[in-house]
């Protein structure tokens, strides 16, 4: 059923509040120049939601029903889709354990809900990252590759500390050595070093971003070399010193593509080039495809037929 936004009645013993069985997704609906609503790769969100559900011991949700629910909601609320390029109707599907029970086990009942809200670009300027060396986001074999609510709770304090130092987000390093780059607070990350694009490989502790996947496909479609591999913070420092760090940008549903100005690491500031021509091309292409201004060569968009 579709209802106006309302409060969710919740028992104090709701298991999600105590044991953290909660996950979410995020995607955007846009509208093309002909007034047709569009969704960006909703099938991939459906797949990832079920991946997260399996990791958290939650039941899977019908992927067909997931996409159909989004289509129905967007069809009803399409007047709320901002027409400006870069803006969208942000969709937040989420699922949580709603059984009233005190005890450590999988819940017997869950709620699946989708809410919608108009949104505009988060970052319009280049951003500054702080490479964290005291806290971790996730460890190998943990829940880092799931879009679990608890992953974000663990990031709140380090993010606030980074912001207090003048940075925008945390750049997470690996849990064992604080050496290998993983991801940014709400984004995956790409570096262009000596003509080659590098993004950390999915090692079981990094979220498989749908924008990340799309950017890799787009770059390869445009004949850029893209490598998914382990990359150390020391390698980035060295590339910056040698003038080989040509670009760096983050990718994610909420931000789209965010150009990185610099990275703070211990007492070092890693400067990135002031220009991001390929990053800007990626951002302009994603935004253009989302409103039908640029041809959808990679079949990202799902049209909502009237």
Q: Which positions does each model-derived feature cover?
A:
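Charged, gly/pro-rich active-site loop segments
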Residues: 73-84
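Helix-start/capping segments and mature chain N-termini
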Residues: 1-64, 68-69, 73, 94, ...
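Extended, Lys/Arg-enriched charged tracts that mediate electrostatic binding to polyanionic substrates
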Residues: 82-96
